[in-house]
């Protein structure tokens, strides 16, 4: 970890995950994309949404207002990490130039031709590894590896091919949808080299990739996210307060059991 990342981690380690809402939607991962070097947010949200994110992020990384292909579902159509950002072919030249002008110079931006154009639904990544939809083009896989500087693997999350919708992981840990078999979760954890846990957001939604955004030192979930769900997010992404960091394995199993009971 470099000095700047260490400083950000130090700042973020005592914070809690924050609830937020884009207009009337709790799917914050649909309207925003958060990495360790930038945050993209859709146009047209409330001032409260922007101020909530900027209060946590703006002192450390740019919070950039943008559209992709004229849409606001920016979190679902692009994929990125601290090194790069990949956008679909529907991205206009003007939008591309705005992103290049707004993001740090160290971030490479690439526009790709891909049949599975909702890249955020079909790819999940951190700064080291990416999981891809099993049917993604080979050329796109190579671009993901090149631009983001990651190892790329085709995978499913508990039989779900939309890996970007059903999981979210950072360099600290990851959340997968609650019906993911334990053996699958263990295999993915080994592959990603980060701890994983199963959970939900927004009061039982298993679309965790759509319902939250997180990096190595901050996380934002929809307003409907319960205290139990929030506790899971804070622990697995290692952004909990010191008291919450004292949770042990028994606590984790209790939280998982509570989530499963809620869904049954």
From Swiss-Prot:
CDD domains: IF6 (cd00527). HAMAP family: eIF_6 (MF_00032). Belongs to the eIF-6 family. It comes from Toxoplasma gondii (strain ATCC 50861 / VEG). This is Eukaryotic translation initiation factor 6. The lineage of its organism: Eukaryota, Sar, Alveolata, Apicomplexa, Conoidasida. Pfam families: eIF-6. One of its GO terms (molecular function) is translation initiation factor activity. One of its GO terms (cellular component) is nucleolus. One of its GO terms (biological process) is ribosomal large subunit biogenesis. PANTHER family: TRANSLATION INITIATION FACTOR 6. Gene3D superfamilies: L-arginine/glycine Amidinotransferase, Chain A (3.75.10.10). The gene is EIF6. It is found in: Cytoplasm; Nucleus, Nucleolus. SMART domains: eIF6. Monomer. Associates with the 60S ribosomal subunit. Keywords: Cytoplasm, Initiation factor, Nucleus, Protein biosynthesis, Ribosome biogenesis. Binds to the 60S ribosomal subunit and prevents its association with the 40S ribosomal subunit to form the 80S initiation complex in the cytoplasm. May also be involved in ribosome biogenesis.
């Amino acid at each position: 970890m470099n000095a700047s990342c260490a400083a950000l981690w130090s700042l973020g380690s005592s914070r809690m995950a924050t609830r937020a809402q884009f207009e009337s939607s709790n799917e914050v991962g649909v309207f925003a994309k958060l990495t360790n070097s930038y945050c993209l947010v859709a146009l047209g949200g409330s001032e409260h949404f922007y101020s909530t994110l900027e209060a946590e992020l703006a002192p450390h990384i740019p919070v950039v207002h943008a559209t992709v292909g004229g849409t606001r579902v920016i979190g679902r159509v692009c994929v990125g990490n601290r090194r790069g950002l990949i956008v679909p072919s529907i991205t206009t030249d003007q939008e591309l130039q705005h992103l290049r002008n707004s993001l740090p110079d160290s971030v490479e931006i690439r526009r790709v031709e891909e049949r599975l154009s909702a890249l955020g639904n079909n790819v999940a990544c951190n700064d080291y590894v990416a999981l891809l939809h099993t049917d993604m083009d080979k050329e796109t896989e190579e671009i993901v590896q090149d631009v983001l500087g990651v190892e790329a693997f085709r995978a499913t999350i508990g039989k779900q091919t939309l890996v970007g919708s059903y999981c979210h992981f950072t360099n600290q840990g990851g959340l997968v949808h609650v019906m993911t078999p334990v053996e699958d979760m263990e295999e993915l954890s080994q592959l990603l080299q980060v701890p994983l846990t199963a959970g939900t957001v927004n009061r039982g939604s298993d679309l965790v990739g759509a319902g939250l955004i997180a990096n190595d030192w901050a996380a934002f979930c929809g307003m409907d996210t319960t205290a139990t769900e929030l506790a899971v997010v804070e622990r697995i992404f290692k952004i909990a307060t010191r008291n919450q960091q004292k949770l042990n394995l028994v606590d984790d199993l209790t939280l998982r059991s509570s989530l499963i009971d809620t869904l049954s």
